Regions:
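Nudix hydrolase/Nudix homology domain
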Residues: 10, 32, 69, 110-112, ...
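Acidic, metal-coordinating catalytic segment for phosphate/diphosphate chemistry
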Residues: 11-45, 51
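Conserved Nudix-box catalytic region and its N-terminal flanking loop in Nudix hydrolases
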Residues: 33-44, 51-91, 95
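A structural signal for short, well-ordered beta-strand segments
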Residues: 46, 75, 105, 126-128
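A short coil-to-beta-strand element that immediately follows conserved catalytic motifs
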Residues: 99-108
Length: 184
């Protein structure tokens, strides 16, 4: 429920797509309920690289319900029912970062991470990559700040300052780094 100018508006809760270990859809559930019950659901993570082989990082907004203020990959979220992974990636890149670039899927993986607020991420994550030299036009409801960082410097900083980054980013990065370095 949201109070807009004294009028209460009931907003439909965002739903996530529940999946099995093979990414077959099992149904949908409210996002908060899925995170409270640690139910496996579909998600995605986008990585945008520039021509200098730097990764576009976002600092999550301080108002986020988990991992506020932490640095992470360019964009991450959940697919909607009936939406392809690439459609979801494009939608959220525009909503969060104001960028539209071609994306391609690199790999998927499953992870589970609990947070100190009682919520748990249990996601089958589709990792995508795109390329752009454009600075984002961030949505400050979602993103506090952004920066470009070389992959090698980032790899060292994740070891030196792990608490500055989201749990899932630390899990994904090594695999992303290996995949990208084999292709660059």
């Amino acid at each position: 429920m949201c109070n807009i100018l004294g009028i209460f508006v009931f907003m439909e809760e965002e739903k996530v797509v529940l999946v099995d270990l093979k990414d077959q859809q099992l149904g949908t559930m409210g996002k908060m309920e899925a995170h409270e019950k640690a139910i496996l659901h579909r998600a995605f993570s986008v990585f945008i690289l520039n021509s200098k082989k730097e990764l576009l990082l976002q600092q999550r907004a301080f108002g986020k319900y988990h991992s506020p203020g932490l640095w992470t990959n360019t964009c991450c979220s959940h697919q909607r029912e009936g939406e392809t992974n690439l459609e979801a990636g494009h939608r959220r890149m525009m909503e969060e970062m104001g960028i539209s670039v071609p994306l391609r899927e690199l790999f998927t993986f499953i992870y589970e991470a609990s947070f100190d607020n009682g919520l748990t991420e249990h996601e089958l994550d589709h990792v995508m990559v795109g390329y752009s030299d454009e600075d984002p036009k961030i949505n400050t409801d979602e993103v506090e700040s952004f920066k470009w960082m070389s992959l090698d410097v980032l790899k060292k900083d994740l070891v030196k300052n792990p608490n500055d980054y989201t749990v899932w980013f630390a899990i994904i990065f090594d695999r992303f780094y290996q995949h990208v370095n084999n292709k660059l």
